[in-house]
Amino acid sequence: MAITRKNLVAFCFTILFIISSIHCLPTTARSPGYEIGPQRRRRVTCFSFSFCKPARGLASCDLFCKRLKFESGLCTGDLEKCCCIDYIN
């Protein structure tokens, strides 16, 4: 079977169409650094109450912070402070 100019052009356009359609598909994962809108800044407020003691459980710090209308709460590494995290626009 001889390769004619018509078949070669059709083949090239087919390959070009396939490559361009694959390249233009949207990605499902979000790329870091390309967020839409302004970046949110984090505000951290720490309390030295005994919410992070092992007897009370580490979830008590998160519950304490959520009751104070913060987004979440984390204990420090030495379990001495409960730090509440809130995001500012």
From Swiss-Prot:
Question: Which cysteine pairs make disulfide bonds?
Answer: C46-C84, C52-C75, C61-C82, C65-C83
Listed under GO cellular component are:
extracellular region
Where does the signal sequence lie?
1-24
Q: Could you confirm whether the keyword Disulfide bond appears in this record?
A: yes
**Which coarse location class applies to the principal site listed for this UniProt protein?**
secreted
Q: Which UniProt keywords apply?
A: Antimicrobial, Disulfide bond, Fungicide, Plant defense, Secreted, Signal
- Where in the cell? Secreted
Q: Which GO terms describe its biological process?
A: defense response to fungus; killing of cells of another organism
Q: Which family does it belong to?
A: Belongs to the DEFL family.
Its protein name is Defensin-like protein 103
Upper taxonomic classification of the species? Eukaryota, Viridiplantae, Streptophyta, Embryophyta, Tracheophyta
